[in-house]
């Protein structure tokens, strides 16, 4: 016997109860146990940082990462779900710096690297319990106990193996290169880390500087927006084909050279200068000039202080002449190509000038701009100063400006494997698909060598030891190898430990480790190997778990984790590291801004779960554009709407079934016979079997959007058609076969639907299943196999018939709404127009249902719209504009004059001739836009090939019937308000008025049947609620149980 179900459910409390049921009965563990030995489905979980609490942005991928493994487990696969933690890197160090009140490399070194790393280890997992509680409360099944941490020695050792494998393949090299650099963190960043940060609009000083040509009183006017780079100037760049002008500035009495196109930008009055000559930039090549600062004069003999050709120079901004210092990627390339200058970098780790630039020593580069400008102005090198508004990158961790500077770093040679990267990308199933060729594919096409070293402390040390005497390098790939080389026992691989490990070289030097640590993205990219301690353990099973069948993360990971996984997969095995990926977009606040505690622009996620339930939140996220890698403007109201429009209707269907099943003592038979006689039963069973096919197909393709859409469509069909149209079958007093078939069908539909929904909304489905399951059923809904379609029960003919009836009903309801005709008000006639003979035949079969649904007395089927409307036409300018040209206006006037019968001919495929002068034009249906004018009292609507019309004239008889239906609805509402049981018989009390008397005279029996009223009594003392039957018709009613 089923338990009684409350109409109003507290879903968060139900979810807490289900969590306890899962924990007490170890359901997750059982779901894993029963699939042991089955085909393995590999899922990689991208490791988050545990330095902050999870937010809505984490909830999206965590929901996706729950749905797919649940589904695959129900499909009979063995799916390991081990949680991972990203424990190294800048995010952790930055948190510790804030905690300790220290900042920068020097202060950390003074504090002590060992002490600093101890603090990192303490803080790194401070939120793990909160993460565990929140993720489990979201309904995600994942094993936290067997999870991995990137700081574990086994994980770190496998990362060393990955590094050495790349090193041995010639894919690792050390070099100076201009890299994005975080001054606050005192370390270079990779290009994709820069993209993780924010580009802000900034106002930088824009300077035009005079560079004096050697042995001449002539000056090159060079432009820059980075004054701080001027002390390191080593060259000047011009465009080879750009035209330059040598002018005499009458006011300054100086000879100046700048791009000809830029003269108007610098001089308002062309009489203020005289053009001496014009020439191409190639004429300036090799010209020497006098340096504006004397800090690096020794570089002159190595080719510094000359003019070079550069294809990146334009006249869009500035003067068409650009100063060169080794702080820009293009500048650095030009200097390397044309000179032998040394690497000039007069900055310390925090981007403050060193004593190489004594006048500005100790100043942060951006702060030095002002003093440098003053210096240049004082010495008459400053020609012009302006402000330049442009977008500039800021560090994604410190929100501090990024500085580009030449720095020694270790790189992965991505250029060398770029062709293979693009090749393996073709084998990945991206969801959404456009990312393959779009965002990810384009990123691979433009991929640069990856800077993987960080001048930091809490990370996996780069395992290279260098001989102090010869520079010989040894790359270490394991703990055992390091022990063998050093003769020391290794217990920990962190920097503060391994930096102490040295050993003598045969050449009389000492092997000392290079000081850098690995970019933490290298570690996360190595996760498939390191989380399994490959190749030191699990080597034989590795081929079964690589590449992953599935991963999921946010859009930003196209330049992060997805990218590093692919680089290392290709480098190691010439393979992608994953076969299928679902990419989600950003979750923003309702105002479109980034969610921020400081902005107070979002609700605490746990408050949302405790208010609406995790199921509602999961469904809201999965239904949204965020699952298609688009942004979502999060709204609490959106979650509330999902609860109201989806979760509660599911509950109502379940409540409806159990309520009547308890009354009639219905018990499902052991073997349900699903071959039914009633068309409604046949239809909903067929729709359910078709749904199974769709879901198995779409989830297998990782198309969650299509899957959810199909589930929601079925829920609507079940609630708003099957149950609503079957109500009277459950209300019958006698338990005949039809009533029993209705019970069996609805039981099967709800129970099966719950199993189909279980991966998406695991709580409510478990709650409902627990009440519906029989003794033969599995202990938990999540221990079931995912349902597969029974093709024998799919009846496409009946699906088409009823779905056509539903379409007509929907159109008629829209038409009523458009013209303010209430659904309870009967109409005398509906006309349905379709030329399709098959549709006409189906409409005849569905006539009784359609008339009942739309509350109409009669239905007529037509083949031609003109029985309901007259046509007018307008010119379709989009089509005609291409072929009419100057005659367009004349023809459009003629089209507007077309008669109804002419337009009908055009609709029927007969072209219509219009003559303009001696030219004839022939109109087809594509050339005109139809306008419909309704006949008489008809109201008409058209959708694709179907047109319907309703007679809007309401007679008095129809009007009274409509009032009766509204009267019944109000009585039913009062029954609900007073918590009467659906089977309770009542006495109905009413006031005596003329309108009610008319209603009773005609519809008393109908009212009693619908409301279970045994008696209708005029009794003023029992009246309790005023009701509105129509705009100006009110009455008072009361009810009591008999």
Swiss-Prot record:
UniProt-recorded Gene Ontology molecular function terms: aminoacyl-tRNA deacylase activity; ATP binding; isoleucine-tRNA ligase activity; tRNA binding; zinc ion binding
BP GO annotations: isoleucyl-tRNA aminoacylation
Record-given protein name: Isoleucine--tRNA ligase
Domain description: IleRS has two distinct active sites: one for aminoacylation and one for editing. The misactivated valine is translocated from the active site to the editing site, which sterically excludes the correctly activated isoleucine. The single editing site contains two valyl binding pockets, one specific for each substrate (Val-AMP or Val-tRNA(Ile)).
Keyword annotations: Aminoacyl-tRNA synthetase, ATP-binding, Cytoplasm, Ligase, Metal-binding, Nucleotide-binding, Protein biosynthesis, Zinc
The enzyme's E.C. designation: 6.1.1.5
Family in the record: Belongs to the class-I aminoacyl-tRNA synthetase family. IleS type 2 subfamily.
Disulfide pattern: none
The encoding gene: ileS
CC terms in the record's Gene Ontology section: cytoplasm
Cofactor names: Zn(2+)
Record SUPFAM superfamilies: Anticodon-binding domain of a subclass of class I aminoacyl-tRNA synthetases, Nucleotidylyl transferase, ValRS/IleRS/LeuRS editing domain
Protein's cellular compartments: Cytoplasm
Intervals of motif 'KMSKS' region: 594-598
Motif ('HIGH' region): 48-58
Native species: Borreliella afzelii (strain PKo)
